[in-house]
């Protein structure tokens, strides 16, 4: 984008600059209480429905060899690059609903992240729920922990000053939950992280896009992930 050398320095040059993705135009929305199935097909005439089927394609690349293929069930990516990239699929408007993900994530060298990644506005916040990672340099401020989905996550906060964002060059905070026992499949109970962040004074605003993303730089690797409600 998610796109982003310290956890946050990395997530800065990467995460911050990665906020220039491509999106699929929604044609409909989804039930207020559920995420739609991943199919890139959206209807458009029900004001009582809020979330469309997965309708957002994150494809941020700055160079190198990155082969990214979204599908009707998720996405796959292979990379060999010193430059940063962030790819994945999700929703134009994020929410606190759970997200299911599953598949492979392998990093041969360099840094790689597998995360739920998104932004909010008012306040402008870039956030990660990091499920797996390889060789990221952790920096920023540790704010606390949260237990969710069978593991403990360490919560970090970082402030980015005059960096690229979904609103252009701006100053904004990053909220990052890092799972201490990494996994490549499971359910992310997003609400648990939002609640934990809020309890620590880390407040989100209006939801912007939200994706299951793979991000990498400085090496090679591959991933194949399915995404669903």
Curated annotation (Swiss-Prot):
It catalyses: Endohydrolysis of (1->4)-beta-D-xylosidic linkages in xylans. Transmembrane segments: none annotated. It is found in: Secreted. GO terms for biological process: xylan catabolic process. Pathway: Glycan degradation; xylan degradation. GO terms for molecular function: endo-1,4-beta-xylanase activity. Its main location: secreted. It holds the Pfam family Glyco_hydro_11. Residues 52-228 form the GH11 domain. It is an enzyme of class 3 (hydrolase). Substrate binds at residues 117, 128, 160, 164, 174, 209. Glycans are attached at residue 31. Residues 1-19 form the signal peptide. Residues 20-51 form a propeptide. Induction: Induced by D-xylose and L-arabinose, dependent on the cellulase and xylanase regulator xyr1. Repressed by glucose through negative regulation by the crabon catabolite repressor cre1. Glycoside hydrolase involved in the hydrolysis of xylan, a major plant cell wall hemicellulose made up of 1,4-beta-linked D-xylopyranose residues. Catalyzes the endohydrolysis of the main-chain 1,4-beta-glycosidic bonds connecting the xylose subunits yielding various xylooligosaccharides and xylose. The catalysis proceeds by a double-displacement reaction mechanism with a putative covalent glycosyl-enzyme intermediate, with retention of the anomeric configuration. This is Endo-1,4-beta-xylanase 1. It comes from Hypocrea jecorina (strain ATCC 56765 / BCRC 32924 / NRRL 11460 / Rut C-30). The gene is xyn1.
